[in-house]
Amino acid sequence: MTSRRQFLKTASVVTAGALVTPSALASGKASPLAAAAPASGKRIGLQTYSLGVELLKDLPNGLKRLAAAGYNEFELFGYNEQAAGFGAGGRDGAVTIKAADYKKACDDAGIKILSSHLSPSIREYKSENFAQFDEFWKKAADLHASIGIKYMVQPSLPSIKNDEDAKVVCEVFNRAGEICNNVGIKWGYHNHSNEFVRVPKAGEETPASNDPMARMRARGEYIEQLFLDNTDPDKVFFELDVYWAVMGQQDPCEWLRNNPKRFRLLHIKDRWIIGDSGMMNFPNIFKAGYDIGIDGWFVEVENGSKKGYTQFDAVCESAKYLSKASFV
């Protein structure tokens, strides 16, 4: 991977930042992850939230279609503690598949389960609840380890009004990371846009502290930065959702460059089908990710609409775009 990364460092930058016009999307260089891909093609990951129950209701055939489209790595969604498996997370029905059965189906289709999104249902992050968080993550880590998953990622933001709230949350994150490390799993946090609002120091809150738009302009520190500053790099990594960073008025490339050892995974996301809007500078984003040696990335396609397209079509079209892109 190192030689490919050195090659990428000499590649030309298409445009500065993460926003781009459609004409810029054709440029880029081959990736180091592509060099490590299976013989069938590039490493292309999918966050299964993109399909929800549409995938689970006919898993074998759905996996075949995704593999044919080019996907060969998964980040799961919908961990179900009671059922010891994975479902649709309450979306579109109650279909749950046992973890071992899910892994076998993916193995049969040639898809590796690399990561998983999950969050505890405990709402209050305070020291009195630490044991409850520990119990959740211990049970989840054991199940995930049993099917060879290497990354567990929390994608939900607790309530944070000041820097002290953030520090308590970070203590929970550090404890979760230590629990996961003990079974050979890396624990991480996934952003949306609210991590890029600012919170004041404890005791300096104002009425504007409860207004997300005002907090984006306010003094104080970004929640994402507080998480980076107050978590142990040996226990907690970060997965950057590049689309939600842009929606939070941030340049994802800048966050990657400024924190090269903390961001290990990416979510590649657009308004709907990847590459369709022309607003995301994917060549720059991939280059920034490869330059810091990311471990992987996953397409996420949320529900949208385009005449004649199903959600499954959108997911497959996204893979088609990335399979042909020279910068991946």
Task: List each model region and its residues.
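Active-site acidic/histidine proton-transfer and metal-coordination neighborhood
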Residues: 11-22, 105-109, 122-237, 312
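N-terminal secretory signal peptides and thylakoid transit peptides that target proteins
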Residues: 1-15
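Acidic (Asp/Glu)-rich catalytic clusters
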Residues: 36-39, 63-68, 92-115, 138-148, ...
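C-terminal segment of N-terminal export signals and the immediately downstream linker at the start
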Residues: 23-57, 61, 65
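Glycine-rich, proline-tolerant flexible connector loops at the mouths of alpha/beta enzymes
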Residues: 76-101
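Gly/Pro-rich active-site loop or hairpin
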Residues: 52-55, 63, 93, 202, ...
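Active-site beta-loop-alpha junctions enriched in small/polar residues
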Residues: 49-51, 77-79, 118-121, 157-159, ...
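Hydrophobic faces of well-ordered beta-strands that scaffold small-molecule active sites
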Residues: 42-47, 74-76, 113-118, 152-154, ...
